[in-house]
């Protein structure tokens, strides 16, 4: 490349930068034209690096100024408000000023309009806003939709708004901050529709209705009008401010560890309360606005399928995102209480899990049942043939074992006396034994996707996927390769480490002596175990002798949520299961992420696991390598401890209330085999995995269960 070419390239690039700011150049003196006036063209002197512009010849042959045309940047197409839509439906309406009250600095105008023989009034701080509210009331009178936008859609008119709400323009202007918010110029822009820390969730927060009972429980739901796209380049706070000016946002709470704070903001729109959470007040405020837009105006800002909640097949007592965010906050809040606001050395963790119980339609009455942490399994040399060591200290597994303690306590409460029966979550079943009361539901929270099939294919937050540099469009496709052989495979955890590996075809049986001689002790992944719970229930084999199968109503992830991968891991891969015993089913719970995704926990995973069950005074800390506490004592969650609880309940339950007749159990293993229907369901599950080509379930050496009850 010669020198002349280089100079041309340099001048060309400089010219582009300069042209970009031509309109913003201030006049240097009185002879220099201002913005929009004629701009003198360069003659090339003075060492200017800009490229010469072609001169235009006047009639006398002299050069003249070429007028710079100012480009108009088209603004976003806004959705038509009620006033505009009513005018299209009923042109020529007359609005009358009825009254003006209030002080000069804060007047209140009342306007009226007559439509179809009815007079509608609206009030506001300006005549324009008063007319708008009157028009909204008029629209509601003859259109069966809750707001103007839905009325517009119902009458066959569509809003053609070409938007890209994930563009870089969707950041907050400083003018919309509350007084207590200070914009951080170094923060990257967040994108509506992502699921990471700097972004919005799958469907945002969705508010609780003013009524405690969802309409879907009492009457058939009305058809939901199709959502319309939002104006481009505008964030939820800006959009809501245009639709409902003057709203006040309230700061509710602040929680979380120092590196992963969570703030909660609220706003009231049309008498309904909405809240949102985020890693700063700005994001929390935006999510509260997003919630209001979704509920009041049917304006959904994120339609990415893989980040949407996967609804359950059963009765849905709660709005999905409200439930997910509430469960997350409750578990994190309880863990904070148990660890002195995360200051305890045992607050260190990679994964946090918990079980929350709801007893009705209001999530405000939800109760944390268990909290746990952990990411490791026992070393083979520490196996116990007396049931005194915990094999698997992964957080979600420990949370479920803690839940078993609670279920035993509730059964004992029922068996105490008639007064306590009302307090218990159990009631007698007409089919024999006991069952949960109708409104009782359990929800599993895990701070990240469970190890195994659910996590292996979603290692990053969705916001990082599908990014195209030319369009800045954040798109996250569904699983591109759903039929690959690796999808759905059974996987086992690595002994004394982290991560999982696929099962071997010949590794379904482990031997006690083989493990003691150095063979790796294999433990099924958390994804596989949760899939198992979705068939045989979370109560396990021993409790199934007393109670009907119990299933999780929802599984909520704090991060790395991907609807396609999670639903496959939890139940889709075994949809071929058949011939299950009565009352057993393939459970399909609600699957959801949370609005404010948990921050990644950096650093090495601790070697301990923490557990707590409601009623416990303090947490229990277990060495994951040995399966016991640091003093070598067995855990309150070990097989032997839970078998003692089972024996105690068995001694109290009248024989006619047993779902399975068992007289004198001798060993832990025999007691488990007595739960015949449970064992049949488990066998069908293992067969379903094999038939689907996903591998064989690997069980622990049978010697682990050959122990008897010793008080």
Swiss-Prot record:
Classification via InterPro entries: A_deamin, ADAR2_DSRM_1, ADAR2_DSRM_2, dsRBD_dom
Gene name for this UniProt entry: Adarb1
Entry protein name: Double-stranded RNA-specific editase 1
Modified residues (Phosphoserine): 149
Residues holding Zn(2+): 394, 451, 526
Region (Disordered): 1-78, 176-220
One GO cellular component, as annotated: nucleoplasm
Stretches with biased composition (Low complexity): 192-213
């Amino acid at each position: 490349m010669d020198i002349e070419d280089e100079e041309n390239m340099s001048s060309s690039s400089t010219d582009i930068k300069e042209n970009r700011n031509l309109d913003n150049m201030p006049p240097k003196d009185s002879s220099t034209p201002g913005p929009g006036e004629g701009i003198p063209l360069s003659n090339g002197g003075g060492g200017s690096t800009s490229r010469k512009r072609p001169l235009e010849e006047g009639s006398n042959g002299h050069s003249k100024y070429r007028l710079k045309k100012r480009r108009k940047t088209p603004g976003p197409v806004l959705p038509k408000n009620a006033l505009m839509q009513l005018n299209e439906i009923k042109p020529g309406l007359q609005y009358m000023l009825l009254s003006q009250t209030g002080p000069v600095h804060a007047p209140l105008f009342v306007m009226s309009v007559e439509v179809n023989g009815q007079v509608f009034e609206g009030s506001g701080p300006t005549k324009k806003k008063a007319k708008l509210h009157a028009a909204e009331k008029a629209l509601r009178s003859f259109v069966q939709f809750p707001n103007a936008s839905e009325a517009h859609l119902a009458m066959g008119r569509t809003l053609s708004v070409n938007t890209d709400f994930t563009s870089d323009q969707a950041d907050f202007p400083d003018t919309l901050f509350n007084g207590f918010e200070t914009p951080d110029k170094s923060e990257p822009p967040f994108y509506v529709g992502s699921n990471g820390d700097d972004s919005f969730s799958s469907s945002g927060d969705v508010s609780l209705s003013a009524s405690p009972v969802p309409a879907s429980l009492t009457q058939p739901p009305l058809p939901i009008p199709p959502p319309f796209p939002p104006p481009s380049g505008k964030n939820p706070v800006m959009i809501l401010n245009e639709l409902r000016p003057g709203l006040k946002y309230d700061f509710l709470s602040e929680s979380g560890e120092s590196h992963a704070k969570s703030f909660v903001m609220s706003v009231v729109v049309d008498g309904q309360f909405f809240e949102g959470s985020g890693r700063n007040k700005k994001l929390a405020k935006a999510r509260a606005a997003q919630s209001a837009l979704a509920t009041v105006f049917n304006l959904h800002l994120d339609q990415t399928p893989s980040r949407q909640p996967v609804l359950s097949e059963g009765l849905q007592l709660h709005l999905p995102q409200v439930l997910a965010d509430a469960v997350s906050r409750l578990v994190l809040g309880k863990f904070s209480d148990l660890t002195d606001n995360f200051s305890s050395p045992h607050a260190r963790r990679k994964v946090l899990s918990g079980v929350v119980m709801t007893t009705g339609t209001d999530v405000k009455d939800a109760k944390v049942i268990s909290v746990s942490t952990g990411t490791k399994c026992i070393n083979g040399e520490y196996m116990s043939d007396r049931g005194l060591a915990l094999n698997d200290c992964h957080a979600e597994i420990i949370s479920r074992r803690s839940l078993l303690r609670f279920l035993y306590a509730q059964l004992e409460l029922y068996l105490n006396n008639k007064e306590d029966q009302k307090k218990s979550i159990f009631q007698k079943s007409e089919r024999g034994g006991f069952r949960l009361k109708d409104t009782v539901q359990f929800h599993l929270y895990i701070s990240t996707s469970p190890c195994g099939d659910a996590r292996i294919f979603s290692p990053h937050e969705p916001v990082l996927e599908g990014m195209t540099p030319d369009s800045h469009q954040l798109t996250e496709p569904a699983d591109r390769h759903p039929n690959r052989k690796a999808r759905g495979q059974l996987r086992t955890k690595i002994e004394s480490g982290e991560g999982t590996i696929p099962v071997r075809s010949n590794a379904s049986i482990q031997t006690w002596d083989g493990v003691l001689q150095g063979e790796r002790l294999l433990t099924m992944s958390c994804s596989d175990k949760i899939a198992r719970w979705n068939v045989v229930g979370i109560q396990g084999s021993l409790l199934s002798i007393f109670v009907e199968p119990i299933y999780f109503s929802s599984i909520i992830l704090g991060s790395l949520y991907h609807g396609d991968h999670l639903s496959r891991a939890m139940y889709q891969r075994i949809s071929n299961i058949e011939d299950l015993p009565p009352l057993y089913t393939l459970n399909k719970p609600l699957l959801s992420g949370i609005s404010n995704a948990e921050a990644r926990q950096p650093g090495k995973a601790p070697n301990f696991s923490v557990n707590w069950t409601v009623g416990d005074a303090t947490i229990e800390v277990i060495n994951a390598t040995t399966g016991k506490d640091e003093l070598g004592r067995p855990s309150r969650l070990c097989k032997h401890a839970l078998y003692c609880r089972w024996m105690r309940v068995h001694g109290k339950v009248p024989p006619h209330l047993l779902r399975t007749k068992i007289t004198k159990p001798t060993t832990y293993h025999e007691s488990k085999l007595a739960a015949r229907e449970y064992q049949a369901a488990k066998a069908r599950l293992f067969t379903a995995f094999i038939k689907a080509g996903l591998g064989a379930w690997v069980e622990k050496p049978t010697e682990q269960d050959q122990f008897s009850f010793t008080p």
